[in-house]
């Protein structure tokens, strides 16, 4: 309606008066509608439908008092760990009273872990590299390699002369400084990550170089056994009672040079876990998700899938399924491997998949569509699923199928998918209660340990001010629900977790 002549002015005045009267007349209904929408959002949030008992309500009140105080202080100072790079925020996180409570909390299971990134690198340096017969050499690119051998390994074109570390340490002036240099080569940690890691390809290159560097240490048979045991110990100390580990099952070697195959490795995982449970009876155990690298040809992946099928038949209680690992942006898409990935179905063999999918910022590409293909290939869980919120139809499909995403916030930040974790896309999914679990990917590579640091980032940053004890409880229970344990094992696990949870609640509520 045009209102620019004298005759139209009374009509305009009448319209404005009507709007004003409507606004003031409905002020109460606006408040009611606002309250209704806020309540609806509260119920939709992850854990929003959980009903807390009296002790849990008290514990929640105390936890939220601490959380709100820390967040208000952060809003005043603009120093907020989840908005900072983890390498620069870690020392601040460790001062947090909320973090100390999260460390106490029984977290259930860690369902997204990689085999040689889960034990603190300090242990590799201070313990493993001090063991007898440990040698070091350098590739033409200056990358470290390690090998245990007696006598000294023969030189090769791929590496410089092998040096016994015991002898080398006797020659260096400052052993502590040398060990610190080893530690720097075993992690991504740096004081200036934004300068050192200018883009995703740079950080991924260093990331995969670390795997290459430490592989010779971890895959020495005596170390391998100790490493598996220590991984369970470190997560157990962080109140995690079950682990599912992506493992490439690379050859494990003896001092003599003898090599063991994949079956030996799976059996060793099984035996070491049984040994750990003997002294930690509440620990549920571990399972392996056999994995191969997505840079390989289709024919190689087809053989790996057949290997996974065979291992799962021989070790049904240990081998959970199969996954593809590596940098999604530069590797093959799931669609590229479609024929190989269909082998189990064609052979009438059940091989569960746990695909990394959507660990990318490139929307609308074949990389991004891995999310869709993972679901079409009947994945059990989605590793990372960083891109899921950009695909509403796929998101709805995964929700209806009750297929969770495995969220690893620190990994996503360090590998440069997101800088400020308040802006992590999973915040939208948390707000609507999408199925998810929290895990830590390769915590040792990031200078972290266990699961608590990732829980902190989720609770304080991604979940915002409204994430509370209900959120934490739901995430812990989800980790049991979405594990690959049998229903009877899940029930046992839930009973053990519930006892620990009740004790945790009592401690928080009374101290």
Curated annotation (Swiss-Prot):
It is an enzyme of class 3 (hydrolase). The active site is at 359 (proton donor), 384 (proton acceptor). One of its GO terms (molecular function) is growth factor activity. The gene is ADA2. It is linked to Vasculitis, autoinflammation, immunodeficiency, and hematologic defects syndrome: An autosomal recessive, systemic necrotizing vasculitis that affects medium and small arteries. The ensuing tissue ischemia can affect any organ, including the skin, musculoskeletal system, kidneys, gastrointestinal tract, and the cardiovascular and nervous systems. Organ involvement and disease severity are highly variable. Its EC number is 3.5.4.4. It is found in: Secreted. Optimum pH is 6.6. It holds the Pfam family A_deaminase_N. Candidate gene for the Cat Eye Syndrome (CES), a developmental disorder associated with the duplication of a 2 Mb region of 22q11.2. Duplication usually takes in the form of a surpernumerary bisatellited isodicentric chromosome, resulting in four copies of the region (represents an inv dup(22)(q11)). CES is characterized clinically by the combination of coloboma of the iris and anal atresia with fistula, downslanting palpebral fissures, preauricular tags and/or pits, frequent occurrence of heart and renal malformations, and normal or near-normal mental development. Glycans are attached at residues 127, 174, 185, 378. Keywords: Disease variant, Disulfide bond, Glycoprotein, Heparin-binding, Hydrolase, Metal-binding, Secreted, Signal, Zinc. This is Adenosine deaminase 2. Residues 30-100 are annotated as: Dimerization. Detected in blood plasma (at protein level). Widely expressed, with most abundant expression in human adult heart, lung, lymphoblasts, and placenta as well as fetal lung, liver, and kidney. In embryo, expressed in the outflow tract and atrium of the developing heart, the VII/VIII cranial nerve ganglion, and the notochord. Its cofactor is Zn(2+). Changing residue 362 to G: Reduces dimerization and enzyme activity. Belongs to the metallo-dependent hydrolases superfamily. Adenosine and AMP deaminases family. ADGF subfamily. It catalyses: adenosine + H2O + H(+) = inosine + NH4(+). Residues 1-29 form the signal peptide. PANTHER family: ADENOSINE DEAMINASE, ADENOSINE DEAMINASE 2.
């Amino acid at each position: 309606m045009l209102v620019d002549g004298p005759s139209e002015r009374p009509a305009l005045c009448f319209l404005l008066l009507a709007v004003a009267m409507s606004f003031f007349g409905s002020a109460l209904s606006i408040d009611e509608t606002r309250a209704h929408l806020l309540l609806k959002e509260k119920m939709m949030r992850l854990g929003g439908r959980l009903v807390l008992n009296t002790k849990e309500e008290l514990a929640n009140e105390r936890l939220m008092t601490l959380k709100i105080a820390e967040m208000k202080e952060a809003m005043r100072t603009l120093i907020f760990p989840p908005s900072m790079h983890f390498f620069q925020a870690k020392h601040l996180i460790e001062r947090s009273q909320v973090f100390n409570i999260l460390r106490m909390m029984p977290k259930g299971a860690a369902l997204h872990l990689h085999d040689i990134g889960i034990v603190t690198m300090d242990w590799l340096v201070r313990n493993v590299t001090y063991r007898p017969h440990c040698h070091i050499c350098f590739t033409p690119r200056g990358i470290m390699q390690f090998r245990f051998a007696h006598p000294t390994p023969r030189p090769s074109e791929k590496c410089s002369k092998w040096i016994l570390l015991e002898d080398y340490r006797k020659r260096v002036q400052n052993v502590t400084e040398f060990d610190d240099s080893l530690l720097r080569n075993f992690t991504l940690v740096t004081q200036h990550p934004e300068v050192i890691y200018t883009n995703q390809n740079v950080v991924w290159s260093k990331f995969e170089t670390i795997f290459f560097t430490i592989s010779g240490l971890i895959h020495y048979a005596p170390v391998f056994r100790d490493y598996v045991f220590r991984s369970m110990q470190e997560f157990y100390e962080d109140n995690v009672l079950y682990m599912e580990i992506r493992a490439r099952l690379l050859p494990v070697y003896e001092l003599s040079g003898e090599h063991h195959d994949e079956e030996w490795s799976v059996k060793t995982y099984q035996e070491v876990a049984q040994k750990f449970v003997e002294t930690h009876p509440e620990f549920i155990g571990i399972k392996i998700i056999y994995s191969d690298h997505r840079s390989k040809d289709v024919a190689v992946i087809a053989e790996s899938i057949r290997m996974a099928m065979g291992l799962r038949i021989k070790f049904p209680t240990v081998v959970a399924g199969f996954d593809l690992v590596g940098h999604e942006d530069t590797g093959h898409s799931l669609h590229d491997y479609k024929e190989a990935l269909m082998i189990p179905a064609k052979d009438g063999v059940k091989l569960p998949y746990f695909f990394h999918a959507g660990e990318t910022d490139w929307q609308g590409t074949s990389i991004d569509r891995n999310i869709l293909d993972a679901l079409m290939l009947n994945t059990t869980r989605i590793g990372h699923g960083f891109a899921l919120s950009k695909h509403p139809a796929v998101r709805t499909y995964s929700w209806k199928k009750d297929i969770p995403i495995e969220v690893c916030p620190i990994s996503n930040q360090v590998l440069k998918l997101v800088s400020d974790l308040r802006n992590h896309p999973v915040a939208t999914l948390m707000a609507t209660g999408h199925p998810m679990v929290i895990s830590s990917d390769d915590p040792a590579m990031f200078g972290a340990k266990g699961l608590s640091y990732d829980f902190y980032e989720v609770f304080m940053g991604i979940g915002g001010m409204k994430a509370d004890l209900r959120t934490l409880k739901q995430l812990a229970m989800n980790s049991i629900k979405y594990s690959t344990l049998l229903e009877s094992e899940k029930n046992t696990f839930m009973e053990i977790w519930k006892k620990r949870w009740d004790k945790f609640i009592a401690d928080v509520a009374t101290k």
